[in-house]
């Protein structure tokens, strides 16, 4: 297992700050857009920004000529699904029916999911008692800071139970997405990040249009929230996420979710 560097810790803190604002950005975007449309717009904007940067910097996307290339594209596709399309859509929809506190605590579950996944799938992160104890203490600390009542607040929405499940499934997707990124063969961080976002947008587009239709021109606050989501918690955050996972591992990266609810 790679020991995290100071640069890794700085990147982790920055990622936590950026992702922490994503719930507010989503709340603003949902004023005018449906949850699937918000997910599509943030991923599409982020993919366009990173594609321009990738091309301008001369970085190349992997081809399809070798088994390794095809394996890389498989991981990129899974990244688009597990790290972008599915969790963004589920969290956006869930936020319509659950308290923000519950959504935040759900993200704090991710490290507890990644630890056993890393142990059994990657074989490089041993699930020693010290780590288990540390991750559990971190989770309990988040609940105490936010307030245990946030877990049982009933908003009165008939779809709230399903929304809670959606938030939990989103957390599981983030955990699996981290493992998937770690398993990917060596590839440019920009190419991997950009490719995952492009595929995520392609997969989201028909679903969002079929379910929610063509969106109307939004209110200014919703537009600002959507642009913020695309540029920072998606474009910039994806680069940081992939970089941290590749250099320090998914278990270390998952600790960012202890910052997000705060």
Where are these regions (language model features)?
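Residue-level recognition of pore/gate-forming positions within transmembrane alpha-helices
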Residues: 16-19, 43-47, 111-112, 135-138, ...
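Loop-to-transmembrane alpha-helix entry segments
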Residues: 64-74, 104-107, 123-144, 157-163, ...
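Membrane-interface helix-cap regions at the ends of transmembrane helices
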Residues: 21, 25-28, 32, 46-68, ...
């Amino acid at each position: 297992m790679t020991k995290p560097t100071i640069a890794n810790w700085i990147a982790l803190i920055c990622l936590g700050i950026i992702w922490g604002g994503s719930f507010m950005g989503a709340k603003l975007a949902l004023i005018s857009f449906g949850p699937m449309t918000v997910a599509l717009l943030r991923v599409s904007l982020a993919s366009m920004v990173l594609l321009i940067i990738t091309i301008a910097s001369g970085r190349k996307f992997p081809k399809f000529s070798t088994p390794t290339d095809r394996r890389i594209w498989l991981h990129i596709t899974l990244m688009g699904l597990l790290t972008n399309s599915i969790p963004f859509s589920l969290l956006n929809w869930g936020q319509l029916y659950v308290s923000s506190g519950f959504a935040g605590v759900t993200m704090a579950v991710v490290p507890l999911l990644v630890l056993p996944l890393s142990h059994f799938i990657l074989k490089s992160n041993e699930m020693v008692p010290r780590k288990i104890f540390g991750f559990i203490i971190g989770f309990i600390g988040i609940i105490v800071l936010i307030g245990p009542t946030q877990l049982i607040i009933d908003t009165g929405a008939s779809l709230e139970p399903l929304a809670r499940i959606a938030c939990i499934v989103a957390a599981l997707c983030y955990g699996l997405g981290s493992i998937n990124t770690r398993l990917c063969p060596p590839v440019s961080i920009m190419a991997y990040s950009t490719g995952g976002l492009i595929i995520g947008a392609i997969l989201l587009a028909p679903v969002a249009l079929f379910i929610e239709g063509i969106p109307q021109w939004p209110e200014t606050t919703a537009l600002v929230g959507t642009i913020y989501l695309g540029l920072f918690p998606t474009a910039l955050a994806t680069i940081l996420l992939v970089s941290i996972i590749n250099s320090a591992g998914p278990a270390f990266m998952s600790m960012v979710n202890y910052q997000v609810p705060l």
